[in-house]
């Protein structure tokens, strides 16, 4: 079985979502996990979640004689990548940065947009952003996207006692 399929089967079987998987230099395998959309109310992935998945993956990769040196399992972070249509559904209403493969002629030939994700309609994705002439809406498909990720929302103000 291919390494990516092996990792996805294991992670999904444990009740998590495989967000991304990378094979880096010197045999490093990085796995990014999150809760499934149904379990999103559990909050953020914890160290204990990563530890459980790491432990299981180590066993599976050893049994399957997979070629790797080191394994890292972590959460996708605050700037979580958006790769699947289900990601755009799940994070509708969130702020995101979307970089397209080709410039959009109806948007001043820009390729990079930051704005609020809208609920997808079929295969059509949408992002509301601040254009030169005020609020604008960009419609695109998953095939148009080069990279996309959430924009971290961090509040550095301390709570008042």
Curated annotation (Swiss-Prot):
Predominant cellular place of this UniProt entry's protein: cytoplasm
GO BP field: ribosomal small subunit assembly; translation
Source taxon at top rank: Bacteria
Naturally occurring in which organism (per UniProt): Janthinobacterium sp. (strain Marseille) (Minibacterium massiliensis)
Key word Calcium present: no
Gene3D superfamilies hit by this protein: Ribosome maturation factor RimP, C-terminal domain, RimP-like superfamily, N-terminal
An annotated GO cellular component: cytosol
Cytoplasm among keywords: yes
Entry keyword set: Cytoplasm, Ribosome biogenesis
Recorded family membership: Belongs to the RimP family.
Official protein name in the record: Ribosome maturation factor RimP
Cystine crosslinks: none
One family name in Pfam for this protein: RimP_N
Task of the protein: Required for maturation of 30S ribosomal subunits.
């Amino acid at each position: 079985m291919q390494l990516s399929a092996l990792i996805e089967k294991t992670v999904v079987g444990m009740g998590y979502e495989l967000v991304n998987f990378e094979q880096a230099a010197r045999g490093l395998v990085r796995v990014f996990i999150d809760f499934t959309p149904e379990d999103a109310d559990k909050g953020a992935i914890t160290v204990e979640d990563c530890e459980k998945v790491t432990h299981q993956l180590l066993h599976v990769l050893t049994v399957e004689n997979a070629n790797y040196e080191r394994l890292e399992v972590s959460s996708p972070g605050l700037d979580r990548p958006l790769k699947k249509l289900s990601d755009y559904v799940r994070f509708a209403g969130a702020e995101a940065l979307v970089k397209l493969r080709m410039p959009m002629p109806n948007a001043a030939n820009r390729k990079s947009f930051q704005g609020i994700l809208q609920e997808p309609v079929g295969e059509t994705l949408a992002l509301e952003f601040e254009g030169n002439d005020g609020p604008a809406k960009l419609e695109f498909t998953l095939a148009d996207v080069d990279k996309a990720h959430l924009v971290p929302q961090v509040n550095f103000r301390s709570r008042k006692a």
